[in-house]
Regions:
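Short beta-strand element of the alpha/beta-hydrolase
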Residues: 23-31
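A conserved short beta-strand
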Residues: 181-197
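Conserved alpha/beta-hydrolase
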Residues: 46-70
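Conserved acidic catalytic loop of the alpha/beta-hydrolase fold
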Residues: 143-160
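Short, small-residue-biased leader/transition segments that mark boundaries at the very start
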Residues: 3-8
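The feature captures the conserved acid-bearing segment of alpha/beta-hydrolase catalytic domains
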Residues: 193, 198-247
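Active-site glycine-rich loops that stabilize anionic/oxyanionic intermediates
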Residues: 30-35, 39-40
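Gly/Ala-rich beta-loop-alpha elbow adjacent to hydrolase catalytic centers
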Residues: 163-172
């Protein structure tokens, strides 16, 4: 449809290229309900990857994915959101594992948080959330479109290391399979979905939340596509305060 065909044309990227930059730039894709703003500074005022990486010699590109933030221009007529992190502040609090918040009860915080949880920090954190301007279909066709968007950027940057967070994990997989000649490595923070070859069995994972259940299902691709990922370095990082029981 026309609403889907324009998706790869509308992404946004900002960049900082230091003098005598290292061989490969780093491209950063934000998570769900977020924009590239999340890589600029932390909510409590500390430096983000936007300045930390260039200071260490890395050319750094920060993306706003299509239909989000500064890439919000779309031909889609609907503004549908199925994502908890863009429907309520409590959903954001829980999804980012700051603690537990089930209104009307007050929010509680997880212990040993590195991020300050004072009023102004929380205010800034919530202001980083931004809605979608069109549907983000959880389909293979849409995933490949986002992979094309990454390839369009890679054609301009040259070979690069791709860094993704949460929902953008799938963009990293599709992008790497779309451009194995240009993606030199993938670094992904808590990827929202994983990739498996068609026909390979995986342990069933269940959730009472329909969206989570949907995202727990792996992205299925041909073995030929999957093998492309096995030929590049991949670093997967998970954080703390991950629940070990159903909630």
């Amino acid at each position: 449809s026309s609403a889907a065909s324009d998706v790869y044309k509308r992404q946004y990227a900002q960049y900082v290229i230091p003098v005598n930059a290292k061989n490969y730039p780093i491209i950063l894709w934000h998570g769900i309900g977020q924009s590239g703003r999340s890589f600029e500074t932390t909510p409590d005022g500390r430096e983000g990857f936007q300045t930390l990486l260039p200071r260490d010699g890395w050319a750094t590109y920060i993306v706003d994915q299509p239909r989000r933030g500064r890439a919000g221009r779309t031909e889609a007529t609907e503004a549908k959101s199925e994502i908890p992190t863009v429907t309520s502040e409590a959903g954001v609090w829980n999804a980012f594992r700051l603690g537990r918040w089930v209104p009307p009860k007050p929010a509680t915080a997880n212990p040993n948080m590195q991020m300050l949880l004072d009023g102004e920090t929380i205010n800034q954190f919530m202001r980083m959330q931004t809605p979608d301007t069109g549907a983000l279909p959880p389909t293979e066709a849409y995933g490949w479109k986002l992979g094309e968007a990454m390839r369009d950027l890679l054609k301009r940057t040259g070979p690069a290391v791709v860094g993704t967070h949460s929902y953008a994990g799938q963009i990293g997989w599709y992008g790497a399979m779309k451009s194995p000649d240009l993606v030199k490595a993938v670094v992904t923070y808590e990827p929202g979905q994983v990739v498996y070859p068609e026909g390979e069995k995986v342990k069933e994972m269940n959730s009472e939340i329909p969206l989570v259940q949907q995202r727990l299902n792996p992205v299925r691709v041909s073995k030929q596509e999957f093998l492309k990922l096995t030929k590049m370095p991949i670093f997967i990082i998970f954080g703390d305060n991950i629940s070990t029981k159903s909630s």
